[in-house]
């Protein structure tokens, strides 16, 4: 079956993912990237950046919850959180569900992502006015370089793929700066693409770079994300000075807020490592 121009299609490494469109709502070229917004038949509103699906109404909750709750429940007392990227503000919303968080700073280089999210994905921006939230539109790499040593408990890197503006967020030099900015027991989590498509090209080099930078331990979280290439995604957690563990498992069992995907059992399951993946990462 061939698809006509009523479909949006993302082509990635000899695979394709398509959604039938109702209409294109917006398109613009910012100084950093091309952003498109569509209304689809089955997945609600869709945001596309440089031809790649960033989020849809239907499944963004999985990604945002897995980028925030596992790492926060793996830290003993996550008061100060930095989000790099995350311009759609969904991860920020999830972070601010945690009463322990006293400060959540989001640094995204492209303000237009946030302004378009406010218009087309307003439910993701519910917490933008929370007094604990601070939204900055700047270079996240430089922000980390300038951060006071030991000032952060958790760094969440909610970036696009490792090309263009996000490429430097996957470098050993950047990870060294993250270690400096993190306090004792400090944790980093970063979206790390698909195990089926990117283990050799992205995930293994990322884990190697994190350890080369000085992180003591790394751990991959696995979760479904059907609108992303292969439908199977990961987030990589790293701790600067101790093993990555589910430190506050009891609190996660009795979390004081609503989620749609995440719970303590999901976190326990997400760290299970498929055999092919384990062999490639750890030999």
From Swiss-Prot:
Known EC number: 2.5.1.16
Main location class: cytoplasm
Similarity comment text for this entry: Belongs to the spermidine/spermine synthase family.
GO biological process, alphabetically ordered: spermidine biosynthetic process
GO molecular function: spermidine synthase activity
Binding site for S-methyl-5'-thioadenosine: 33, 108, 139-140, 165
Gene3D superfamilies on file: Spermidine synthase, tetramerisation domain, Vaccinia Virus protein VP39
This protein's name: Polyamine aminopropyltransferase
Catalytic activity field: S-adenosyl 3-(methylsulfanyl)propylamine + putrescine = S-methyl-5'-thioadenosine + spermidine + H(+)
Residues annotated as binding spermidine: 64, 88, 158-161
Record domain PABS: where: 5-240
Pathway(s) it belongs to: Amine and polyamine biosynthesis; spermidine biosynthesis; spermidine from putrescine: step 1/1
